[in-house]
């Protein structure tokens, strides 16, 4: 017996168009696990998330699963401070990684949580992902200056 879709969310404009296209091109199991992860985020986050995350996170999950299955590794050094900059979101992202591991029986490195964290932050803000990367890069530069000038690591404080 097929499962009946029970969740409702509203996308408008470009996000709606992107989601409609994505549904045609994305395996249903990626969409379903993405919805489970987003439901977890919404239940455990102290901040509201816009529904655009259904498009961006599902697309990210699909690309991540395919990349891992093809054995393609990704350099995440530019995202090392995401954990300390967005602590709450990072914890949610780690749980999402565990959900993906369980759903797809793949080894997914915890570092992938950095990208998922940025998707959560993007959904909390009205900014786009490029602005989030820029903000994160600036904050990492500030952290480096503080570390070099005062020998104080603010990452874990």
At which residue positions do the language-model features occur?
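A cross-family "folded-core" feature that marks the main globular domain of proteins
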Residues: 1-157
């Amino acid at each position: 017996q097929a499962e009946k879709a029970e969740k409702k969310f509203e996308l408008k404009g470009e996000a709606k168009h992107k989601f409609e296209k994505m549904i045609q091109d994305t395996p249903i199991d990626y969409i379903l696990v993405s919805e489970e992860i987003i439901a977890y985020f919404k239940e455990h986050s102290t901040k509201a998330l816009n529904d655009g995350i259904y498009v961006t996170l599902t697309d990210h999950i699909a690309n991540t699963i395919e990349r891992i299955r093809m054995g393609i590794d990704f350099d995440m050094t530019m995202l090392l401070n995401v954990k300390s900059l967005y602590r709450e979101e990072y914890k949610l992202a780690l749980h999402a990684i565990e959900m993906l591991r369980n759903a797809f029986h793949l080894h997914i490195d915890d570092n992938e949580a950095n990208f998922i964290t940025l998707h959560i932050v993007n959904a909390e803000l009205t900014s786009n992902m490029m602005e989030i990367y820029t903000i994160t890069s600036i904050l990492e530069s500030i952290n480096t200056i503080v570390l070099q000038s005062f020998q104080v690591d603010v990452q874990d404080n």
